[in-house]
């Protein structure tokens, strides 16, 4: 019987996704080769644990799928990223549209995005964004499916701190839900028209007000204390990666400034999303990466307005980064399969 490439990949992805999520603990706090996390047994904020290999640490960062995710962009991106064969994928949040009170709608959104994530065939580490947690229904869904909103893990001598900028979350005004989902529905029916009308829609007073409230960074004292304890328990990783949804360094957030102070003396990189616009800054010798989109709508023009992923490979001198546009990741037919990508 002839097995096609599609049959093989389908079986591979199905087998990978079926693996159980197991949290391994580190009794010594040392950064060894094996995966370890501080998350107890129960719901995990990742889809599967990385498998140990002898190759250097390599992972892929993906930007916002929402707000106003363009149909098919994120789904195809997960297939494209699978070609890169990363150890795992790291999300900067805004995975679902959210902003809805009905649990059935939120569950449907998670089910849809998890079907796309299953195409990766590798772990997908979640970071919560303001679209993922913004009311009781979305918070419940996150808690049931992904567990804690901030957590850490170590892998191949690197420490990863995944923070929450929605601690506590901010509710959007109820009056914005109906117009928001009118635009979401238009994106599904006529994406070209929706993309053309987006700037005027975002300028509506009720939408602009919701956007302003959504830009607020919330990091609790408890979370800052957890960061301090985690860094104390892991004093000498080869590198520390700090992941959060909103680029808190751009808003001069006092809580994040405390965390920056705790990172002094370490080799570290900070990675965020939210703005839908790519920027890179070198702050006191450290890389601060603000991811653009992986499906989310354009919010302003300019060279940073791209659908992309960033591939990271650890070397003896530190991380090596490559920025890859989705419409430049081509299959053997020379096709990205991304007609709506920027």
PLM features: what roles do these ranges have?
Residues 29-51, 104-234, 239, 255-271, ...:
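Extended active-site neighborhood of metal-dependent phosphoesterases/phosphodiesterases
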């Amino acid at each position: 019987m002839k097995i096609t490439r599609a049959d093989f990949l389908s079986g591979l992805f199905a087998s990978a996704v079926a693996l159980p999520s197991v949290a391994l603990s580190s009794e010594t706090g040392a950064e060894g080769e094996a995966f370890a996390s501080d998350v107890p047994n129960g719901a995990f904020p990742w889809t599967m644990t990385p498998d140990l290999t002898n190759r250097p640490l390599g992972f892929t960062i993906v930007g916002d799928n929402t707000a106003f995710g363009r149909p098919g962009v994120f789904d195809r991106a997960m297939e494209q990223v699978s070609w890169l064969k990363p150890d795992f994928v790291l999300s900067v949040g805004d995975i679902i549209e959210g902003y809805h009170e009905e649990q059935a709608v939120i569950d449907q959104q998670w089910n849809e995005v998890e079907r796309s994530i299953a195409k990766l065939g590798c772990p997908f580490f979640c970071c919560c964004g303001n679209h993922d947690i913004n009311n009781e229904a979305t918070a419940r869904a996150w808690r049931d499916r992904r567990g804690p909103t901030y957590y850490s893990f170590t892998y191949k001598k690197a420490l990863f701190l995944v923070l929450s900028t929605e601690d506590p979350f901010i509710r959007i005004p109820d009056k914005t839900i109906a117009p928001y989902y009118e635009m979401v529905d238009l994106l599904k029916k006529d994406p070209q028209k929706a993309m053309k009308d987006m700037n005027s829609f975002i300028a509506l007073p009720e939408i602009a007000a919701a956007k302003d409230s959504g830009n607020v960074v919330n990091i609790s004292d408890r979370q800052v204390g957890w960061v301090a304890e985690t860094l104390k328990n892991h004093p000498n990783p080869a590198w520390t990666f700090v992941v959060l949804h909103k680029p808190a360094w751009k808003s001069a957030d006092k809580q994040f400034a405390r965390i920056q102070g705790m990172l002094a003396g370490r080799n570290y990189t900070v990675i965020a999303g939210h703005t839908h616009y790519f920027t890179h800054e070198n702050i006191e010798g450290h890389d601060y990466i603000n991811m653009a989109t992986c499906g989310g709508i354009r919010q302003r023009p300019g060279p940073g307005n791209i659908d992309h992923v960033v591939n990271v490979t650890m070397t003896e001198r530190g991380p090596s980064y490559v920025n890859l546009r989705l419409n430049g990741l081509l299959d053997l037919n020379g096709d990205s399969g991304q007609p709506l990508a920027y």
